[in-house]
């Protein structure tokens, strides 16, 4: 199979409004948002080649952050085109700050797994994202501890963000992050993430993450097992940044006799596809930031992000993704310029 290539230029305009309220307790409200457009040229699509690419609306984002005494509130809502799932809540939680080291969040909150917030630097994310193991938020409760050089996150998630479906209804594909869909549902998931920081001139981060939860099958009404673990390393030296992560996942649904258990359906952005039920994921991302601070340009970040999904299922071909590009920061405007190459990749191939 030949490699599929895509050139993407997303343009992001961000707006923030901070509204401090003058009162004795000093509640605080911050309203923000962004409007993003994409230019995309996909070499495997004849219509894209013939027209010289496509320039489209991507997303309108609304952010609300508020705090009062020790209570925090965070909301991130996205408005995508109907073909990409339409409106969806990316994150929405209420939190309590016991002190500077201990915090609690309840609601649709980010799953603590791997290098945060992302293993890469580009618009496309790395392959972890497409396996539901990066930039994902689920419904549950999360405890966060951060003191000196240590970070600890403990979380329990009752289920994925169901988007109004329940019972025997299949998971809606109108969602921001990839979750298990089809006749299987995520249930009763636990997460542990531990990170240690060290170094001064060279700043290092070593971390480990564990995920364990159920896979409820609506046909057999039995719960299988979902497990994943990751080891990550992040290094910063002056303008350089290096991120590396190894991830292993194993999905074991309990399906009716004769049904294929080697694949599991994932859904997001109004569409779904299948992934191997067992795999290792390797990611390496390197970036270099150049401060400019002249005219309209603040800085440039050059990067290369590579990820490989090694499928541990007989007869399956591995998937890979490599994105070379840069991001441009221009005040409230942020632009990615990415050259993406993929093989056996749902978003970089003939599926879409």
Where are these regions (language model features)?
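Predominantly the C-terminal beta-signal and adjacent terminal strand-loop region
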Residues: 330-352
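Flexible, surface-exposed loop regions and adjacent strand-edge segments
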Residues: 48-52, 121-127, 169-175, 224-226, ...
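Transmembrane beta-strands of outer-membrane beta-barrel proteins
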Residues: 29-35, 73-75, 104-106, 152-154, ...
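Detector for outer-membrane/organellar transmembrane beta-barrel domains
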Residues: 196, 200-312, 320
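Outer membrane beta-barrel
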Residues: 25-42, 51-163, 195-199, 283, ...
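Sequence/structural signature of outer-membrane beta-barrel proteins
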Residues: 38-46, 78-83, 113-115, 120, ...
